[in-house]
Amino acid sequence: MHVAVFGGTFDPPHNGHLAMCLLARELLHIDKVILSISNNPFKLLRSDHDDHRKNMVGLLASELKKTELPAEVSGWELQKKTPSYTVELLRFLRTEYPDVQLTLLVGEDSYREFPLWKSYEELVLLCRIAVFRRVPPEQIAHREQRLEMIGNVRFIDFDCPISSTTIRADIASGRPVTAKIPSAINRYIIDHRLYRD
């Protein structure tokens, strides 16, 4: 079994997150995705907004299940009372899933800072890493292969201009975001009046 681990703040989850998971299934033959809601390592107090993030990630998992990709939400990092780091999450998941292939999904920006991550050398022993690198769509269309492998790291060409930061700004400014987030998450944001200020 091949399990992808996709961590993030998911504030909010959006169509880019959905597309990354589906592309990972297509190119890496993923059987299941674990969506781990990350804490800011410098913010130790939980807030009501963490519950909203967890609920929205649950809706993202439901969207993935509609495509027949099993998805599970992990709140392990949110429950910790100490700063959480990716290597700790992977150690935990390795005990939960001792006999599966784990692949960590990361964006290109995060991967550039990889040598600064806590115990980054151990990470490549605990899992494979799939890096979604930004490539303009016209370049993707002319490449024979969207997947490149170097050692334990897979580089996947990916073009998605959507970001949680711009979605929050759009909502605060009253601009529509229906093309950027799944409809169930959009409804949740409206119902709970999130990102209004």
UniProtKB/Swiss-Prot annotation:
Any one GO biological process: NAD biosynthetic process
InterPro entries (alphabetical): Cyt_trans-like (IPR004821), NadD/NMNAT (IPR005248), Rossmann-like_a/b/a_fold (IPR014729)
Cited CDD domains: NMNAT
EC assignment: 2.7.7.18
Name of the top EC class for this enzyme: transferase
GO molecular function terms listed in the Swiss-Prot or TrEMBL record: ATP binding; nicotinate-nucleotide adenylyltransferase activity
Keyword annotations from UniProtKB, A to Z: ATP-binding, NAD, Nucleotide-binding, Nucleotidyltransferase, Pyridine nucleotide biosynthesis, Transferase
Gene3D superfamilies registered for this protein in UniProt: HUPs (3.40.50.620)
UniProt-listed Pfam families: CTP_transf_like
Annotated catalysed reactions: nicotinate beta-D-ribonucleotide + ATP + H(+) = deamido-NAD(+) + diphosphate
Pathway info: Cofactor biosynthesis; NAD(+) biosynthesis; deamido-NAD(+) from nicotinate D-ribonucleotide: step 1/1
Function: Catalyzes the reversible adenylation of nicotinate mononucleotide (NaMN) to nicotinic acid adenine dinucleotide (NaAD).
HAMAP family named in the record: NaMN_adenylyltr
Family: Belongs to the NadD family.
Protein name per Swiss-Prot or TrEMBL: Probable nicotinate-nucleotide adenylyltransferase
Protein's organism: Chlorobium phaeobacteroides (strain DSM 266 / SMG 266 / 2430)
Gene this chain is encoded by: nadD
